[in-house]
Regions:
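Rossmann-like dinucleotide-binding cores of NAD(P)H-dependent redox enzymes
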Residues: 1-8, 106-108
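FAD-site-proximal beta/loop scaffold in flavoenzymes
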Residues: 27-93, 97-101
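Glycine-centered tight beta-turn/hairpin loop motif at sheet-sheet or coil-to-beta transitions
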Residues: 23-25
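A conserved short coil-to-beta-strand element within the FAD-binding core of flavoproteins
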Residues: 6-18
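Hydrophobic residues embedded in beta-strands of well-ordered beta-sheets
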Residues: 18-20, 127
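Glycine-rich beta-alpha junction loops
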Residues: 10, 32-40, 116, 124-126
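Active-site-proximal substrate-binding core of FAD-dependent oxidoreductases
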Residues: 100-144
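C-terminal auxiliary extensions adjacent to catalytic cores
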Residues: 129-175
Length: 175
C-alpha cells in the first residue's frame, strides 16, 4: 500500500536495502520512491546578487526585477504561485511581451493573472484537472472531473506544447 509520513524528513536513500533513512533516526522501506526535492534557486542565481531570501524579487504582474529591463521567471522568481511549468509558461509569455515592447521602444499592458491547470491521473483512463487563478479580482480554484474526456484534453495539452516548444509531434508511446 501507499503510506504518507507527514513531518518526517528523508535525508538519504539506501537503494541496496530499499530503505529511506529519516532524519529522526527511523527508516521507511520502499519498492518505488517518489519525492519532490526542496525547491531552491540554482547556485548561479543565488550568487548573482539578484536574490532576496533565496528568490529573485519581481513585479508579480510583469516579472521585471528591481533592475530596469531585467526579468526573472519560473522557479527563480518570487511570485506567489506554485513552481510548476504551467505557471512558468505564463510568466514567460508576459515577460516576453514586456521585453519585446522595450526593444520596440513601446510599452506593454500585459499582466500575469496567476492562472494555471494541473492534470491528475485517477487510473482507468480517467483524468481530473485542477484549475486555479491566484491573482486578480476573481481568484478561484476548482477540481474538475475525473473523466475520460479530460484524458484527451491532457494528451492535447502535452502534444500542443511539444509542437510549440520542440517543433515535433508528440504522440503517446504505445503500452
Amino acid at each position: 500500500g501507499i503510506e504518507w509520513h507527514p513531518s518526517r524528513e528523508v535525508y538519504e536513500l539506501d537503494p541496496a536495502r530499499g530503505v529511506a533513512l529519516l532524519r529522526d533516526g527511523g527508516e521507511m522501506p520502499y519498492d518505488l520512491f517518489l519525492a519532490v526535492p526542496v525547491h531552491r534557486a540554482p547556485r548561479v542565481v543565488l550568487e548573482s546578487g539578484l536574490t532576496m531570501d533565496g528568490w529573485i524579487a519581481v513585479d508579480s504582474l510583469t516579472f521585471e526585477t528591481p533592475y530596469a529591463g531585467v526579468y526573472a521567471i519560473g522557479d527563480v522568481a518570487a511570485v506567489g504561485t506554485p513552481r510548476a511549468g504551467v505557471f512558468a509558461e505564463g510568466h514567460a509569455t508576459v515577460a516576453a511581451e514586456h521585453i519585446a515592447a522595450r526593444i520596440r521602444g513601446t510599452t506593454s499592458s500585459a499582466q500575469y493573472g496567476g492562472h494555471g491547470i494541473c492534470y491528475l491521473e485517477f487510473g482507468d483512463d480517467e483524468v481530473g484537472m485542477v484549475d486555479v487563478t491566484f491573482f486578480g479580482d476573481k481568484r478561484s480554484g476548482e477540481l474538475i472531473g475525473p473523466s475520460t474526456e479530460l484524458a484527451a484534453d491532457k494528451a492535447q495539452f502535452g502534444s500542443s506544447r511539444a509542437m510549440r516548444w520542440f517543433g515535433r509531434d508528440w504522440s503517446a508511446i504505445p503500452a
